[in-house]
Amino acid sequence: MFFINNIIHILLNKQISKVYSKRFTNYNNTPKGVFWNSTLSQDLRLNIIINKILSLCKQNTISIADIGCGYGRLWNIIKERNLETKINYYGLDINKDFISFCQKNINCQNVSFELGTFPSKKVDYIVMSGTYNLTPTNSLKVWEKYVFENLCLNWKLADKALIFNCLINQNRQIKNSLYFTELLWIKELCENNFGKTEISKHNLLPNDLTITIKKLS
């Protein structure tokens, strides 16, 4: 069973990476290049995540792993907010074009980028913004299993909290290659398998949820 799951993950990752490579070639390092509608919506989602981390952290310096980092927009926002001296940032993505772009264009001592779906060591916070929205499969069962198993891997490596956002609808579904979850379902999944789960919404993002799962201190 593990072997089959591993093969499925590899195939899904290859399909996702192929779609993003084509998109990035057409739109470069813009919100459209990573399937976001606009700079406003992309940056709002990322700022919500940063604000959540800042509300939780107590230490002077923290480490963040950004899963599905794309062209590194989260790090750019961290710099724009003058937080770069406070944060050790690790950007991860399954797409080599994104990682290559980030390595060439972002050169900071406390920043690194690498291929992967989870960090190579424990960090304080692991975040995913839009990472599981776009899906190459129409099978809800296959995709939710993929998402859950990725969350499990990252939960083990998050020292303080796991924070991610997702699209929501009244019913869980895949529509136009986008995965929509349902509020009560995703909250129950996270609480039953991980820990205390906080759901937050923003009035400018009516179809989004931001989910924060905190580790016991």
For every predicted segment, state its role.
Residues N133, L167-R172:
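Short "lid" loop at the C-terminus of a central beta-strand within the Rossmann-like core
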Residues M1-P31:
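N-terminal, positively charged/glycine-rich alpha-helical extensions of SAM-dependent methyltransferases
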Residues Y125-E144:
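A short SAM/SAH-binding and catalytic strip from SAM-dependent methyltransferases
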Residues A65, G72-Q109:
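Class I SAM-dependent methyltransferase SAM/SAH-binding core
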Residues A158-C166:
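Conserved beta-strand signature within the Rossmann-like core of class I S-adenosyl-L-methionine
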Residues L40-Q59:
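Conserved alpha-helix/loop element of class I SAM-dependent methyltransferases that forms part
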Residues N107-F118:
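Conserved SAM-binding strand-loop segment of SAM-dependent methyltransferases
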